Design a protein with these regions (language model features):
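Soluble "head" domains of membrane/secretory-pathway proteins
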Residues: 2-11, 26, 30-36, 41-221
């Protein structure tokens, strides 16, 4: 009984704090959240240590703490960067949308073709170890990274048709990304939201010091 009274008193004395925690949890679950990127699969757009803001109502309004969609608010577009809980990969992933439902997509020696149209790739920079390309996908322009001297089965795939309710996604770091080439199409119900900005960034290779030049940086050109 004494423990129960102590608990009741504790709750009563901290009602404002508990309400704030509940509201913040609901906000992060259903409206917006952030995600620390641990890998380089989206380089150079996103690098290790970036903390990304995610708009969780970009495509659906979901019941907090569930995957139940209450209202469809939009649909992913070509070039969107999405965060999703991949059942196939058994982890949360962040990738760029390349193929929409109904699209016919193929890749030949790193060059993507969608519905018979080959994407424009303009060489921006070349070093001893890599190429950087500016890739144009509808209204989206983004930089992709291609490492040299790497033999990989990720460089090409035959024509595939994206099923209804699914998306084909790739990482911008094309030869260092486990994406639809590995795990297949992404079903819509796995989507958590659209990544929009770098909120904060720390340099893993320099004592985790802040990289202020990346703070509040948009992920889109």
């Amino acid at each position: 009984m004494a423990r129960l009274k102590t608990l009741q008193k504790l709750i009563k004395n901290n009602q404002s704090l508990l309400l704030f925690i509940l509201l913040m949890s609901c906000f992060r679950s259903a409206i917006a959240d952030w995600y620390i990127v641990p890998t380089g699969s989206m380089k150079p757009t996103i690098i290790e240590g970036d903390q990304i803001t995610v708009n969780k109502i970009a495509y659906d309004l979901k019941l907090p703490f569930t995957s139940i969609s209450l209202l469809k608010t939009g649909a992913p577009a070509h070039g969107d960067i999405i965060v999703f809980e991949s059942v196939a990969a058994d982890t949360r992933l962040i990738k760029r949308v390349i193929g929409l439902p109904g699209d016919v997509v193929s890749m030949s020696n790193h060059v993507i073709t969608i519905n018979g149209t080959t994407l424009n790739q303009r060489l921006l920079n070349e070093t001893a170890n890599e190429y950087l390309f500016l890739e144009t996908l509808d209204k989206s322009k983004h930089i992709t990274r291609l490492k040299k001297h790497v033999n990989s089965n990720l460089s090409s795939f035959p024509k595939v048709t994206v099923p209804d309710g699914h998306y084909l996604v790739l990482g911008d770091n094309r030869l260092n990304s486990a994406d639809s080439r590995v795990y297949g199409f992404v079903p819509h119900h796995e989507l958590k939201g659209k990544a929009t900005h770098v909120a904060f960034s720390r340099d893993y290779d320099n004592f985790y010091l802040p990289r202020s030049e990346r703070w509040f940086k948009s992920l889109y050109q």
